């Protein structure tokens, strides 16, 4: 695909997955790291360099073999990179050494972002690493506050919570002689992340906003998309893109942020490389974060939409596989359960097991977060058997049929049969707007998260159910007026059809759940073309049926036709 050879400083799991992406594009890669590192295990070339990515001579050897240098870890020797750039002016280095230096020092990183009007957590440099220094910071920020190493820190290593004055000495003992800075305590409600890829021209593309769950300061789970309102997800995406725009050079960047209780977003830190929070992209997105990085540093095309989810209904959970604390290789039991689970993919890194070491990850990709969570539950061993719905790979419902009373069931069952005829997964239940208002509210709000794409709501009399549900969900709602005992359903029809502006409800004829189901299938066609194909076939069948009747009528005459019809 490209004649450039990419030299990678670092041969860990991130380098390994960069190599995999580059191989698919016929791009040669050479690795600088220890012999038999994870990236070298899957690239059997003799050109690799055994050595340290912080050693000038080793970096020179790598530069002699490459057209482009990039990093899988930011803890490289930037001064050495700059010297190499001077020695080999034709060798491109991405991200630029200046960018790597800025991001390496987390305090400089924050000051850089502040200068570019990017919201970050409040912080201050620690000048002399003394107890008095930390006490003064405590007076400024209050307790607790976070003391952090400015450099060589990741996965919580280099962080210490200063809970009160008595912890100041302990903090200095723990962090020793590192350069330090302090952050004001940030009472976040969620941790979010956005992968952003930057082209050499400065154009940025954001992957979906995700939610990260940490245990012992190590990323444990990633939910994609994040379990937050779409407006907040978009806000996070804009913040991440603005942050990455402020740096020079190209490549993929991992942007971590905090979501506060007041819905304010603050950047926590940025990594100038592929990131753990982006591993889900391998299976869930059009292009993985690793391929995006390769494209960026080699100047390959990055078309609009290449960082989006593969489908509009994609939901994914990434699980980190860590070395077991007690029993070596016990973590492989999780991997085995994942291999038994439909829609789960296992990625192992070729590492020797150590407690809490990142040994691999598992991606679970389905059409709803509820489905993904069910599969994850089995993988983690929370359930001992694969749920029947997973064993049979039963599809999650796409359409919800609800009614105010079981007396509406004879009407709504007709629509259910239509959905069943088409093979559309659906659910059917009773939700009363007046008798179970809390249940109705919960059903409407949670419906999108459960993977529903459309709701059919049948109601008679006052018929408030369709409108109330439509007011609480962004999904399309189809109202079915049910014929009552007094006004023949006209009251229900008028109630459903007369919705105020801004709260649309598609309303079908009285008792006509058939059309409601058919309309729901057409709506599904906007998500998946197979439903358009099914609907087109249904319409052709109707045409064939009517043409057949017309032919018979014309052949035998209306009197015999009517006699035969009455007999039936």
From Swiss-Prot:
It comes from the Eukaryota. Residues 110-298 form the ATP-grasp domain. The keyword Disulfide bond does not apply. SMART domains: AIRC. InterPro entries: Ade2_fungi/plant, ATP-grasp, ATP-grasp_carboxylate-amine, ATP_grasp_subdomain_1, PreATP-grasp_dom_sf, PurE_ClassI, PurE_dom, PurK. Pfam families: AIRC (PF00731), ATP-grasp (PF02222), PurK_C (PF17769), RS_preATP-grasp-like (PF22660). It is an enzyme of class 4 (lyase). Its EC number is 4.1.1.21. ATP binds at residues 138-193. It catalyses: 5-amino-1-(5-phospho-D-ribosyl)imidazole-4-carboxylate + H(+) = 5-amino-1-(5-phospho-beta-D-ribosyl)imidazole + CO2. HAMAP family: PurE_classI, PurK. In the C-terminal section; belongs to the AIR carboxylase family. Class I subfamily. PANTHER family: PHOSPHORIBOSYLAMINOIMIDAZOLE CARBOXYLASE, PURINE BIOSYNTHESIS PROTEIN 6/7, PUR6/7. This is Phosphoribosylaminoimidazole carboxylase. It comes from Candida albicans (strain SC5314 / ATCC MYA-2876) (Yeast). The lineage of its organism: Eukaryota, Fungi, Dikarya, Ascomycota, Saccharomycotina.
